[in-house]
Amino acid sequence: MDERIISSETVDAEEVSFETSLRPQNLSQYIGQDKVKNNLTVFIEAATLRNEALDHVLLYGPPGLGKTTLAMVIAAEMGSQIKTTSGPAIERPGDLATILTSLEPGDVLFIDEIHRLSRAIEEILYPAMEDYCLDIVIGTGPTARSVRLDLPPFTLIGATTRAGLLSAPLRDRFGVIDHLEFYTEEQLTEIVLRTSNILDTKIDDLGAREIARRSRGTPRIANRLLKRVRDFAQVRGNGTVTEKLAKEALTLLQVDPRGLDTIDQKLLHTIIQSFRGGPVGLDTIAASIGEERETIEDMQEPYLLQIGFLQRTPRGRIATETAYNHLGISYEKEV
C-alpha cells in the first residue's frame, strides 16, 4: 500500500510516460474545462486567420488538472512545434537565451512551474514576450555593451500551481490567463472510461463512477487510481472493474469515499484533536504532521477547501463541522 497514491507531489518518469500515452490530440478530445476550451478555440482561430502567434497564455490551478496537456493541445491546434522546460531548470540567463534563440516562427515555449523563475530570468523574458527581442550583454567591465537580437514571433505558455507568486510585471504580459478548475464527477467518469479503453481494461459504468468519485476532482488521480484498481481486478477479480471491486480496492488503498487519503485524514485529525479544530497556522500543521508547508498548500488544502472540510482565516486554518461529521467526531460549536 502506498499512502501517497493520492497526495504524492512527485510524478516519476513512468507516470509521465503513462500520462503522455493518454493525452488528447486536440481540443475536441480534451474533456472538461469547457469555458477555457471555448475561449481558446476563438483565440486560436483568430490568431490563425491573422497568421499571427497566439497571445502568451498563463494556465494556473492545482496539480494534475491538465495544464501540461492543454499546452500540448494548444500547440497541436496551432500546428506549432512545442519546446518544454520548467522554472527550476532555467538557472542562468544564458539558459533562457539559448532556448529563446532556438525558437522558430510560431513555436510554442512551455514553461512549467513558471513561478519559480528568478527575477533576473524574468527580466530577460519581458522584452522577449512584449517585443520579440532579446537583450544580451557582450563583454565585461568598461567594454561591456548591450546587443539586441530579434526573435521570431512565438507563444509562451506558462503553468503554475501558485499564480500569486508570479510578479505583477510578468503576469501582466500574458494576454490569456486561465484558471483550471476541479473536474465534476461526470467528467472524471468520462475520463476513466476513456483511459480504460486506451489501456484495454474492462470496466463498467458504476466502477468508473466509483473511481471518479474518489479522485478529488483531478484527472491525474483518476488515472492513477484506475491503474491500481485494474491490478486488483486482474489478481482478485475476473479482470473487470466493477463498482464492488473498485470500492474494495480503494478501501484497501486507504482512499475513502470522498477521496481523502491517510495524509488528508492525518491533517484534519491533527487540527481537530491537537488544536481543538483551529484556527491553527499552516507552519504549525506542517510541523505536526511532518509535511512541507508547500506540499500542504499545493496537494491537500485546495481540495479540502473545495469540499468544505477546511476554512482559511486570517488567524489560521479551521476544520469545519462537515469535516467533523465525515470523520465521525462529535462537533461542539463554540458559544
Curated annotation (Swiss-Prot):
This protein's UniProt keywords: ATP-binding, Cytoplasm, DNA damage, DNA recombination, DNA repair, DNA-binding, Hydrolase, Nucleotide-binding
Any one biological process term the GO annotation gives: DNA recombination
Cellular localisation: Cytoplasm
Family: Belongs to the RuvB family.
Biological role: The RuvA-RuvB-RuvC complex processes Holliday junction (HJ) DNA during genetic recombination and DNA repair, while the RuvA-RuvB complex plays an important role in the rescue of blocked DNA replication forks via replication fork reversal (RFR). RuvA specifically binds to HJ cruciform DNA, conferring on it an open structure. The RuvB hexamer acts as an ATP-dependent pump, pulling dsDNA into and through the RuvAB complex. RuvB forms 2 homohexamers on either side of HJ DNA bound by 1 or 2 RuvA tetramers; 4 subunits per hexamer contact DNA at a time.
UniProt key word DNA-binding: yes
Keyword Translocase: no
Record protein name field: Holliday junction branch migration complex subunit RuvB
Comment field on protein domains: Has 3 domains, the large (RuvB-L) and small ATPase (RuvB-S) domains and the C-terminal head (RuvB-H) domain. The head domain binds DNA, while the ATPase domains jointly bind ATP, ADP or are empty depending on the state of the subunit in the translocation cycle. During a single DNA translocation step the structure of each domain remains the same, but their relative positions change.
Single GO MF annotation: four-way junction DNA binding
CDD domains, per database record: AAA
EC number, UniProt record: 3.6.4.-
Source organism of this protein record: Listeria monocytogenes serotype 4b (strain CLIP80459)
One GO CC annotation: Holliday junction resolvase complex
Binding site for Mg(2+): T68
Binding positions for DNA per the UniProt entry: R293, R312, R317
InterPro entries per the UniProt record, alphabetical: AAA+_ATPase, AAA_lid_4, DNA_helicase_Holl-junc_RuvB, P-loop_NTPase, RuvB-like_N, RuvB_C, WH-like_DNA-bd_sf, WH_DNA-bd_sf
UniProt catalytic activity: ATP + H2O = ADP + phosphate + H(+)
Residue numbers spanned by region Head domain (RuvB-H): 257-335
Stretches for region Large ATPase domain (RuvB-L): 1-183
Subunit structure: Homohexamer. Forms an RuvA(8)-RuvB(12)-Holliday junction (HJ) complex. HJ DNA is sandwiched between 2 RuvA tetramers; dsDNA enters through RuvA and exits via RuvB. An RuvB hexamer assembles on each DNA strand where it exits the tetramer. Each RuvB hexamer is contacted by two RuvA subunits (via domain III) on 2 adjacent RuvB subunits; this complex drives branch migration. In the full resolvosome a probable DNA-RuvA(4)-RuvB(12)-RuvC(2) complex forms which resolves the HJ.
Residues where ATP binds: L22, R23, G64, K67, T68, T69, E130, D131, Y132, R173, Y183, R220
Region entry Small ATPAse domain (RuvB-S), spans: 184-254
Enzyme class, broadest EC rank: hydrolase
